[in-house]
Amino acid sequence: MNDLLDKKCVPCEGGVMPFDISEIHKYQKKVDGWEITKNKEEIFFLSKKFKFENFLKSQDFVNEVGKVSEKEGHHPDISFGWGYAEIKVTTHAINGLSENDFILAAKIDKIISV
């Protein structure tokens, strides 16, 4: 079982360094299908696109992601439409990835497996 599912996101208000590339790759192995991307400011994100049968199933998934995100106190960027939802996660306070991002990714994946 993924040990990230047993963890809780810890509030981050800065003052810590974002993961370096070796830490990112170590944690990426724990979240299947999540890609490492960078935005134009060179900030790392985790991203994943989920596919669904229709708009309503996409919306239901996004609503469940919202519930998990609120519970964890860590909020992704979400876009969705007919048959898809795309999730992007980063720790804005440190301009990069932290363990919180991988915890949230694992918990989002669990929504799909239920």
Model regions and ranges:
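Long, contiguous binding/interaction regions
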Residues: 1-56, 60-114
